[in-house]
Amino acid sequence: MSVNSKLYEGKAKILYTTDDPEVLLADFKDDATAFNAQKRGSIQGKGKINCSISSQLFKQLEAYGIKTHFIDSPTPNQMLVKAVKILPLEVVIRNIAAGSLCQQTGLPVGTILKQPLVEFYYKNDHLGDPLLTRDRLYLLELATAEQVDAITHLALQINEFLNKFWQQCGITLVDFKLEFGLDSQQQLLLADEISPDTCRLWDTTEEDSNRRIMDKDRFRRDLGNVEDAYQEVLQRVLKAVETTN
């Protein structure tokens, strides 16, 4: 399969068209951003690590019955994906209070939620990716009520699977972001990536509130050892996959 032209460049990936209109090539970058790209940097090897982690998790989710855009990973930092029209929504699933949830509600960091919280954010950097109510979501016509219900159901299914998987890795899944898209048949697919860039991950065996962090919060908060943390997550994922298979 040949790669044609650049279709889109985002913060973490570049998308290219291929000779198949139904297939795109995603090239994962080492670039790192935080706070809606107000903070920028680079994490050495991040592209390869995130592509590898995402590929493994997409395969596991497909086997679990979740339809994703994943096709194959021809190189360590590249992924062949089904072409989808991304819904302009960031779907955040929270199991433990952290980040903006604590800032906006006053909940102490680390509070275990009685049930997973599913939130929708408007995928719009110019507006700062604001939290949406369902009524606002419908007002902006970002998705239909049927799509929102389907996404919520899928998000909870994905959370149930990933919670168990990360536990096998000795990692606590605090919260994470998902994106969904529609293929040419209007089928809803899980898209984007699942990685330390999009998940808040804590080392289950580490009690120190800083040392336990294994995700992009290390970059956001200048905690150091970002590359080592990402690499450790990858190694644990590969070990868990090997054990599962």
Swiss-Prot record:
Key word Nucleotide-binding present: yes
Protein origin, superkingdom: Bacteria
Pathway: Purine metabolism; IMP biosynthesis via de novo pathway; 5-amino-1-(5-phospho-D-ribosyl)imidazole-4-carboxamide from 5-amino-1-(5-phospho-D-ribosyl)imidazole-4-carboxylate: step 1/2
Catalytic reactions on record: 5-amino-1-(5-phospho-D-ribosyl)imidazole-4-carboxylate + L-aspartate + ATP = (2S)-2-[5-amino-1-(5-phospho-beta-D-ribosyl)imidazole-4-carboxamido]succinate + ADP + phosphate + 2 H(+)
Position of the signal peptide: none
PROSITE patterns the record matches: SAICAR_SYNTHETASE_1, SAICAR_SYNTHETASE_2
InterPro entries attached to this UniProt entry: SAICAR_synt/ADE2_N, SAICAR_synt_PurC, SAICAR_synth, SAICAR_synthetase, SAICAR_synthetase_CS
Keyword Ligase: yes
EC number: 6.3.2.6
Gene Ontology BP terms: 'de novo' IMP biosynthetic process; cobalamin biosynthetic process
A Pfam match: SAICAR_synt
Keywords: ATP-binding, Ligase, Nucleotide-binding, Purine biosynthesis
Molecular function GO labels: ATP binding; phosphoribosylaminoimidazolesuccinocarboxamide synthase activity
Family: Belongs to the SAICAR synthetase family.
The name this protein goes by in its record: Phosphoribosylaminoimidazole-succinocarboxamide synthase
Species the sequence originates in: Nostoc punctiforme (strain ATCC 29133 / PCC 73102)
Phylogenetic placement of the source organism: Bacteria, Bacillati, Cyanobacteriota, Cyanophyceae, Nostocales
